[in-house]
């Protein structure tokens, strides 16, 4: 299969939405759509009284509205800082480039975001917002956990559209050749992925980290009522994401220029294994804590 010739810049008819070096790209649009849909879904969760057993929800819809800005900043700042620290600083070529042009750190429009950095940025945003609003930060994390896969799904789809983060070479019939006119134009006539079929690992991640993780977390929220069990949804997110990411690292192409880690580990594995470990501990603790009994009458949040 040949990778479809999709321009990473969004077009309306024949017009590209571009102003000099700045352009509206599918990757940026994926962030916007993911955040907006996640915001509305979080408000829906807060307003669904059945999920809270008659107790007051963790946050109000107005607080969710305010939290969106904090989370957006956490995603952008954390994602970029994480990419610089976890990848650029360990890549000899990129590290040398940063030494010559340190302000390249701020060129987010040229690409380079880390999920794990964005995850830590969102965690920081939740902690700071929870302290300001005097909300239990772990319960606030439980509210955000079922929402996160929405953004992950759109982000991985955008990775696919960009023709980046492709997988290892494969002989499977769904293997894809990540080479087309757009990619050649952006890489001085070459195709970084070569001309052999590769795993479309971006789509694997969209399916597991996006669709399947969304279904698991929302089953836990709606059927198991785990929004009432402090820390359980955060734990489920950490465990599932850690498992999915570690398993998919086997088909993702290794990051170019990164050092060789022991035991065949990749940076994605190194950053995901602690998530898995913390998630197991959190779930063990959450399942031991008693759940407040449901109230006689459901509380309908404003």
From Swiss-Prot:
Task: Kindly list the GO molecular function terms attached to this UniProt entry.
Answer: phosphatidylglycerol-prolipoprotein diacylglyceryl transferase activity
Instruction: Look up the record and name the pathway of this protein.
Output: Protein modification; lipoprotein biosynthesis (diacylglyceryl transfer)
Q: Where does the UniProt annotation locate this protein?
A: Cell inner membrane
Membrane-related topology note = Multi-pass membrane protein
Q: Which residues cross the membrane?
A: 26-46, 67-87, 108-128, 231-251, 263-283
Which EC main class describes this enzyme?
transferase
- What's this protein's family per the entry? Belongs to the Lgt family.
Q: What is the recorded name of this protein?
A: Phosphatidylglycerol--prolipoprotein diacylglyceryl transferase
């Amino acid at each position: 299969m040949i990778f479809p010739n999709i321009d990473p810049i969004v077009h309306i008819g024949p017009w590209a939405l571009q102003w000099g070096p700045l352009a509206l790209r599918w990757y940026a649009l994926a962030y916007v759509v993911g955040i907006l849909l996640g915001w509305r879904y979080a408000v829906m969760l807060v307003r669904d009284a059945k999920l809270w057993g008659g107790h007051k929800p963790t946050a109000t819809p107005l607080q969710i509205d305010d939290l969106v800005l904090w989370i957006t900043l956490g995603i952008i700042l954390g994602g970029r800082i994480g990419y610089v620290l976890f990848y650029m600083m360990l890549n000899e070529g990129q590290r040398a480039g940063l030494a010559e042009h340190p302000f390249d750190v701020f060129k987010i429009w040229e690409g380079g975001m880390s999920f794990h950095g964005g995850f830590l940025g969102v965690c920081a945003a939740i902690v700071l917002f929870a302290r300001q609003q005097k909300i239990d930060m772990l319960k606030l994390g439980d509210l955000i956990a079922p929402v996160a896969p929405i953004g992950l799904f759109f982000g991985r789809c955008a990775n696919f559209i960009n023709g980046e983060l492709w997988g290892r070479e494969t002989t499977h019939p769904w293997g894809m050749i990540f080479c087309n006119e757009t990619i050649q134009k952006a890489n001085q006539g070459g195709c970084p992925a070569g001309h052999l079929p590769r795993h479309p690992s971006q789509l694997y991640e969209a399916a597991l980290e996006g669709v399947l993780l969304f279904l698991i977390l929302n089953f836990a929220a709606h059927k198991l009522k785990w929004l009432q069990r402090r820390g359980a949804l955060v734990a489920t997110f950490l465990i599932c994401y850690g498992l999915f990411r570690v398993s998919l690292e086997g088909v993702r192409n290794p990051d170019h220029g990164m050092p060789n880690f022991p035991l065949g580990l990749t940076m994605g594995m190194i950053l995901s294994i602690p998530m898995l470990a913390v998630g197991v501990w959190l779930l063990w603790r959450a399942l031991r804590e008693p759940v407040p009994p449901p109230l006689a009458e459901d509380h309908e949040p404003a």
